[in-house]
Amino acid sequence: MRQLLPGDTVWRNIRLATMDPQQQALYGLVDNQALIVREGHICDIVPETQLPVSGDNIHDMQGRLVTPGLIDCHTHLVFAGNRAAEWEQRLNGASYQHISAQGGGINATVSATRACAEETLYLLARERMMRLASEGVTLLEIKSGYGLELATEEKLLRVAAKLAAENAIDISPTLLAAHATPAEYRDDPDGYITLVCETMIPQLWQKGLFDAVDLFCESVGFNVAQSERVLQTAKALGIPVKGHVEQLSLLGGAQLVSRYQGLSADHIEYLDEVGVAAMRDGGTVGVLLPGAFYFLRETQRPPVELLRRYQVPVAVASDFNPGTSPFCSLHLAMNMACVQFGLTPEEAWAGVTRHAARALGRQATHGQIRAGYRADFVVWDAEQPVEIVYEPGRNPLYQRVYRGKIS
């Protein structure tokens, strides 16, 4: 019989989907297991027969399914306002590019967000965060990018820090100052990139407000040369990088981000084989964002088969934002990734666990149920992981465990 230490907590009689690629079974499934949690981490995984049937801090899950906590590795959670009117315009035939050129798009949200009080932004973002937590999310990336000036970018990152301080969910904050050219720099995008590189990145990094730098390399964002200036600045300071690339056209953004060993290349609908090979060589994760593909009614799908062939890890995220993916649901994103992009349900699960952890640089501590990893996991009223992907309108979450505590 396995001896437990004072303070240990046990979840026994579980069906465990470890998402450990070293396990032979689909989803890393093993039955009749028990998790021993100690000081917020998984201490051990043992057959339940090795543990007492009952006792203090022993939770009998009656055969329920347990998976790693979900990870949403790409969100724009902190913003004010909405862009419902733009959606109507698109339904009537206007393109995303046309709306952006008319001062809509990202800059419309920038105006609303700049005018919004920090406390109001916090309350809006907190409600969104808790919606994701209710689906079993335990690690969440939050980008800035709706300030496009030093003061408001800092305000957004302070909101992310305040959310993290609640200890309800892990937050990975990302500086996305290179999201769009603000109205005041409309005729001088290079001048805005200078502001990003010489002021925003170094000052906000010095304050410890973000973990990585992101950018939007696209015809409605920044060109390759401008994007490279951002990457060079970040890497010179030792900051991890990532990028929104190849969403609406093929500019070579994935190759660029991969050349700087980017954590991830996101969207990638127009990615070509050269870009896929570069991602493999750079150790860059491909992040699929099916919500934006759906909402923009795009037709160019990411090259999933090429990503498989080159063994590029593929993550899936909600891309929750007011303009192109107003879906605050990672379950829905998983379903869309399967239906629209052809992922298998197991690939979708890998995309919101171990591959999503890699996209945030957290692969050594998050995204799998393994000894030594963080005790972030979810107990489901389900028999198979596929059920969560199959029926996104139903949430079978039974229990969410964060840092070893039921939350």
UniProtKB/Swiss-Prot annotation:
Residue positions binding Zn(2+): H74, H76, H244, D319
Residues annotated to bind 4-imidazolone-5-propanoate: R83, Y146, H179, Q247, T324
Textual note on the cofactor: Binds 1 zinc or iron ion per subunit.
EC nos: 3.5.2.7
Pathway: Amino-acid degradation; L-histidine degradation into L-glutamate; N-formimidoyl-L-glutamate from L-histidine: step 3/3
Cofactor(s) demanded: Zn(2+); Fe(3+)
Residues that bind Fe(3+): H74, H76, H244, D319
Database matches in HAMAP family: HutI
Protein name: Imidazolonepropionase
Species of the source: Salmonella typhimurium (strain LT2 / SGSC1412 / ATCC 700720)
